[in-house]
Amino acid sequence: MSLLVVGVSHRGTPLSLLERAVLDSDQATKLLDDLVGSPVVREGMVLSTCNRVEIYACVEKFHPALTLISELLSRHGNVNFDEIAGHVHVHYDDRAVQHLFAVAAGLDSMLIGEHQVVGQVRDAFRLAQERGYAGRDLHAIVQDALHAARRVRAETRIDSAGQTLVDVGLQILSERLGPLAGRRALVIGAGAMASVAVAALTRVGITGLTVASRTLRRATALAQRYNGQAAALEKLADLLAETDVVVSCTGSVHPVVDAATLTKAVAGRTNPLGILDIALPHDVDPDVDRLPNVIRVDLETLRPVLENTASSADVRHARHILDEEFDAHVARRAAVGVVPTVVALRDKAARVVAAELRRLEKRLPELDPRQFEEIRTTVHRVVDKLLHAPTVRVQELAGLAGPDSYSEALRTLFDLDPAQPVAISAPQPSTDSPARAAYQPTDEAATDAEPRRDDAEPPSAAAAQDAGRESRP
């Protein structure tokens, strides 16, 4: 079982195209249902943010899964796959795992080191768990990626400035408008990014804050935390006329602020209105750029500014940590790979002991039950002690050199049947789900991953080229 990642991101994809490819929550859920409901994908999750749309799938075969994902992106997205094919990145097996590690750590973000993406990865995985699509393999990979991200954040200064996209955007606005302290601000949206925006605006010293959202309850809860006011989105035209700075981040698939509404709002203004649109797709119609006294900053504006936000030393340190964590992940995966053979060995030993005890019972019927039970206990204890050290050691060695050679050695030495079923728990088909039932151990129990399939079918260069370019994480 190998991990396959197919997606588009801010790296190499025009934002005008990326904003059309972004999936809303309903689209992502439906795509996930069809993905894991297919016979070619066992586990999966969908990560859709303002920076990327990526499908993560645990698969046996590369080519059928790649074809399926391409079809699903066209079926559930807002863009035909042919339009984005030249921008698609494809990662497989170890490269796919390394890519997820980099994404979770913020090293593949538009703002290097930003930590909102950790929550986005966690949310994507949680949805997969809730729908029964996160089994042992995906669980191990995601938990190791989140652990690696925590190490990067704790051991480097890659996000020491605490900057977010909003912080950088407000800096650009202040360069064009002048200091933002003392100005009135309007935040459109009430989700996680809106909360980040409100905090950033508070730090720069705005004096009047209004949060507008379709869900007034959420807007009120957010505004009250910062002594602001809440308003319904229906009052947007009036709110725009009364504010100096707007930060919009709704996640709507259609523009929230159109040129006609803003034309009325800025009529007669003498001071410019600053707009920071960090939504993808755009919340604010780009046509507003032609209006007088309107200064708009969006993700396209931010992209070149964000390229050099983290120091090269911090990035190198972070990548070194990710390399260490990836090596540890591979070692754990390899150690688990020898477990079926170890279980088969212990199972054979138990069957041999049981047969010999039955033979002894027939040959010495004069033994009373107490004596026979003492013999049984002693024999089991001897066998357990003989097997304990080598089976523990073989798992340690497999973690260093891979499971295949040690598994083969055990099977040869003890004449184990490689096809013999062993008692290892695994995700089972769910009667109420088209995919595998969820496997939900604790978040830190990331060592139950199945063995890495070194003989899994590798992606051909032609297939990767057909789907897009294969990029390094």
UniProtKB/Swiss-Prot annotation:
Task: For this UniProt record, give its keywords in alphabetical order, as a comma-separated list.
Answer: NADP, Oxidoreductase, Porphyrin biosynthesis
Question: According to its UniProt record, which reaction does this protein catalyse?
Answer: (S)-4-amino-5-oxopentanoate + tRNA(Glu) + NADP(+) = L-glutamyl-tRNA(Glu) + NADPH + H(+)
Judged by the first EC level, this protein's enzyme class is: oxidoreductase
Active site per the UniProt annotation:
50 (nucleophile)
| Disulfide bond annotation, renumbered to this chain | none
Is NADP there in the keyword field?
A: yes
UniProt-listed Enzyme Commission number(s): 1.2.1.70
Alphabetical GO biological process terms: protoporphyrinogen IX biosynthetic process from glutamate
Coiled-coil residues: none
Give the misc comment: During catalysis, the active site Cys acts as a nucleophile attacking the alpha-carbonyl group of tRNA-bound glutamate with the formation of a thioester intermediate between enzyme and glutamate, and the concomitant release of tRNA(Glu). The thioester intermediate is finally reduced by direct hydride transfer from NADPH, to form the product GSA.
Concerning its family, UniProt says: Belongs to the glutamyl-tRNA reductase family.
The protein's name in its UniProt record? Glutamyl-tRNA reductase
- The organism named in the record is Acidothermus cellulolyticus (strain ATCC 43068 / DSM 8971 / 11B)
Q: Which gene encodes it?
A: hemA
